[in-house]
Design a protein with these regions (language model features):
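Cysteine-nucleophile protease catalytic domains, especially the papain-like/related folds used
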Residues: 1-50, 55, 61, 131-156
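Short amphipathic alpha-helical surface micro-motifs
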Residues: 26-27, 47-50, 74, 118-124
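Active-site-adjacent substructure of cysteine-protease-like catalytic cores
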Residues: 47-107, 111-112
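Noncatalytic regulatory segments and standalone regulatory/sensor domains
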Residues: 24, 83-84, 93-156
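Residue-level signal for functionally critical sites in structured catalytic/ligand-binding pockets
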Residues: 1-2, 6, 16-18, 88, ...
Length: 156
């Protein structure tokens, strides 16, 4: 949702979830994420085997990148490097010398991971039966920002 807002798309979350065919069991597939971006005319580049430095270059160019990684697992789950069942989408919006900063829909705050933590978690299965494994997948938004930081409206 944050990448849509960044690109100036004003659409209700329920409609986006319907377009993306999001379900409670498998979430939203990468294919359907890309469909939604295309539906709204957004220019994106998606690929696997990205690195933290690729994310830094995208941020430097003013381009947020959505990625899928492992997060918020329970105590009984395997180590993140071996876990493919706790996939979660986040958007890279910044960085420090040794960490990547995210907009995270599961947090009220921005979140971060060190480069090493990110590399250990940056994989997922793309839902459904016999899903493909994704490694280092990211989707970088090339559409320029249309977000108006100073725009406010009255809450009716």
């Amino acid at each position: 949702m944050s990448m849509l807002v960044f690109a100036g798309v004003e659409e209700r979350e329920q409609r986006i979830l319907k377009l993306a065919k999001t379900d409670k069991k498998d979430g939203t597939s990468v294919e359907n994420i890309l469909f939604v971006f295309g539906y709204f005319g957004m220019d994106v580049v998606a690929r696997e085997h990205m690195t933290p430095d690729d994310l830094r270059k995208a941020v430097d160019g003013g381009h947020p990148t959505m990625l899928t990684l492992q997060a918020y697992r329970d105590d009984k789950a395997p180590a993140y490097k071996d876990d493919f069942d706790d996939g979660h989408y986040v958007v890279c919006i910044g960085y420090t010398e040794d960490a990547i900063i995210f907009e995270d829909p599961a947090s009220f705050h921005r979140t971060f991971l060190s480069d090493g933590e990110l590399i250990e978690r940056w994989h997922d299965c793309d839902g459904g039966t016999n899903p493909p494994k994704l490694n280092g997948w990211g989707c970088t938004l090339l559409t320029p920002s249309a977000y108006k930081h100073d725009l406010t409206e009255h809450m009716d």
